[in-house]
């Protein structure tokens, strides 16, 4: 959430940011409501001052034995006006808050202008796409022939965009989760959390999923519960409504969770394979930092996610998202895209974002630089470290062999009981 004082003071900067994003939002309506709210507050304060003055005058007249009926009548009238205005102020505040929750974050000055993902800027590449002496196949074909992915039974049990991992496929999924968590905890210094998979609406609002993306979420009927779309939600809200000791920053958390997304806008896209499922696993990295450190911490976050791909020997590229492709809550985002030879494209496997104080304002997460300092909002960051299903798909496609088997990356073999090759069983 943006600071209302900032919007009030810099309306044209906010308007320009909305235009760069291609966001449709009635900023004038918000500014008008803000004016109305402040005018009503001024009026009610003036009435309260008058009520206090009349009350003192009534007390003086009564003490002197003089009549005070006219002032008592005025007192009743003023009190009634205050009650009515207080109700109007509450309604205006609710409407104003609802609008504030719909304003996206301000893009960082380094974010390139653009309307779609085709305008994103490539920053760097790592690794060479493997050269095959045969036509590489997509992971869904490899997985089904090796009997380690079962999309048909996933559809039977749950519906479209669900699947089973089986045998070595299930073990590979588990190996990837453990490998990622061990790397981030042991080498990168994150504290591991295992979060709830159900959160309340306040948590979803705190990270920016609600109210804007309600259609993409799975809600438990007649309950204040949502299935998490990412561990970012519970882990960020882990510190909601808290004031942190500045000496403990940055705080870094790594968490595995299953993720659940309705994919309401994805009809017809990526209908095969593991790329766009309603349920998938992900290891998430979340940071809480001082404002002056957040940009440096973003670069470190990207490097932490990159190391997963490098250790797996998976070719990838890093792209800086343009204004039109930037997430609602993000100020700046890097995407990591892994090479998928069976599809001949780079596919997103991680998004690493700096949200500045946008989420912290919504979730009321603050810190004190020293014990007597004023509490200020932290900056929050998060990134996928990585999306597990997409990583599994990338391993199958990049390590496939001419005979249809798949070589297990060396760093995963200790997690696979020493298995070096996945064959059909």
Curated annotation (Swiss-Prot):
This is Serine--tRNA ligase. Homodimer. The tRNA molecule binds across the dimer. L-serine binds at residues 230-232, 284, 384. Pfam families: Seryl_tRNA_N, tRNA-synt_2b. CDD domains: SerRS_core. It comes from Desulforudis audaxviator (strain MP104C). SUPFAM superfamilies: Class II aaRS and biotin synthetases (SSF55681), tRNA-binding arm (SSF46589). Signal peptide: none annotated. NCBIfam families: serS. GO terms for biological process: selenocysteine biosynthetic process; seryl-tRNA aminoacylation. It catalyses: tRNA(Ser) + L-serine + ATP = L-seryl-tRNA(Ser) + AMP + diphosphate + H(+); tRNA(Sec) + L-serine + ATP = L-seryl-tRNA(Sec) + AMP + diphosphate + H(+). ATP binds at residues 261-263, 348-351. Consists of two distinct domains, a catalytic core and a N-terminal extension that is involved in tRNA binding. Keywords: Aminoacyl-tRNA synthetase, ATP-binding, Cytoplasm, Ligase, Nucleotide-binding, Protein biosynthesis. The keyword Hydrolase does not apply. Its EC number is 6.1.1.11. It is found in: Cytoplasm. GO terms for molecular function: ATP binding; catalytic activity, acting on a protein; serine-tRNA ligase activity; transferase activity. InterPro entries: aa-tRNA-synt_IIb (IPR002314), aa-tRNA-synth_II (IPR006195), aa-tRNA-synth_II/BPL/LPL (IPR045864), Ser-tRNA-ligase_type_1 (IPR002317), Ser-tRNA-synth_1_N (IPR015866), SerRS_1_N_sf (IPR042103), SerRS_core (IPR033729), tRNA-bd_arm (IPR010978). GO terms for cellular component: cytoplasm. Catalyzes the attachment of serine to tRNA(Ser). Is also able to aminoacylate tRNA(Sec) with serine, to form the misacylated tRNA L-seryl-tRNA(Sec), which will be further converted into selenocysteinyl-tRNA(Sec). Belongs to the class-II aminoacyl-tRNA synthetase family. Type-1 seryl-tRNA synthetase subfamily.
